[in-house]
């Protein structure tokens, strides 16, 4: 089943050329320092429930096993992790761009108090509202389950902020192909996004990486007249 999915995957026209950790911030408006002579980099953010597999997906995406680490206190960690990532056009290495991959703190952890949830909302909301260079958000959800209330609230925040986002269904290797197609349609309807913006993925089987790469490259306009 998984091999069939891999064969049907879109070919990646971009590749990751570099990936490294920059900084973890405790204020939503705090950003990595801009090197003199450089312009501020565009940002691509990843967000999702605690234990959705966000760190594993980020590591799969950049092909670095331990770049993003799992929080020891799911639902309570309020830091935004920034990574410097380079992406290049496969057929011409001279065409490329660097961007900031932003790992936002997880939400929806059952043991977290209402006060902690409000703090998360204010913290992440502050980042989303004030990040002028944010180009796109990947919202991760576990493909095995129905849309959760916290996921629906997150999608409402993104829609309300008019921030473009795509849904990434994680852990696809755990279910059948027929179930995948069914869940893709369910999540597209639940989050009010076109089906083509719902990506089926698996960090374990490296499913969905090509589609993620192509979307990021297109959002950043890597292959444009300016590059």
Please report, for each region that a protein language model flagged, where it lies by residue.
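Canonical P-loop GTPase G-domain recognition
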Residues: 16-31, 174-227
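Structured catalytic cores of enzymes that bind and process phosphorylated ligands/cofactors
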Residues: 44-52, 58, 65, 84-87, ...
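Catalytic acidic motif of RecA-like/P-loop NTPases
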Residues: 59, 106, 145, 173, ...
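Amphipathic alpha-helical transducer elements in NTP-driven molecular machines
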Residues: 77, 117-121, 209
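Flexible beta-alpha connector loops of hexameric P-loop NTPases
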Residues: 107-117, 174-176
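Conserved C-terminal guanine-recognition region of P-loop GTPase G domains, centered on the G4
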Residues: 121-196
């Amino acid at each position: 089943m998984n091999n069939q999915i891999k064969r049907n995957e879109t070919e990646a026209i971009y590749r990751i050329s570099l990936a490294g950790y920059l900084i973890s911030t405790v204020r939503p408006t705090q950003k990595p320092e801009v090197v003199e002579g450089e312009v501020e980099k565009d940002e691509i953010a990843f967000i999702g429930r605690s234990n959705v597999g966000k760190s594993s997906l980020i590591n799969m995406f950049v092909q670095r096993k331990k770049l993003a680490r799992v929080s020891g206190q799911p639902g309570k960690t309020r830091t935004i992790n920034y990574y410097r990532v380079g992406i290049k056009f496969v057929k011409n290495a001279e065409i490329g761009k660097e961007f900031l991959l932003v790992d936002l703190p997880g939400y929806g952890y059952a043991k977290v108090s209402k006060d902690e949830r409000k703090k998360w909302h204010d913290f992440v909301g502050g980042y989303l509202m004030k990040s002028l260079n944010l180009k796109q958000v990947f919202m991760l959800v576990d493909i095995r389950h129905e849309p959760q209330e916290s996921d629906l609230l997150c999608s409402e925040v993104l829609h309300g902020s008019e921030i473009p986002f795509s849904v990434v269904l994680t852990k696809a290797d755990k279910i059948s192909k027929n179930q995948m197609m069914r869940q893709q349609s369910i999540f597209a309807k639940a989050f009010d996004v076109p089906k083509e913006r719902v990506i089926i993925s698996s960090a374990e089987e490296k499913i969905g990486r090509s589609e993620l790469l192509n979307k990021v490259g297109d959002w950043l306009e890597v292959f444009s007249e300016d590059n």
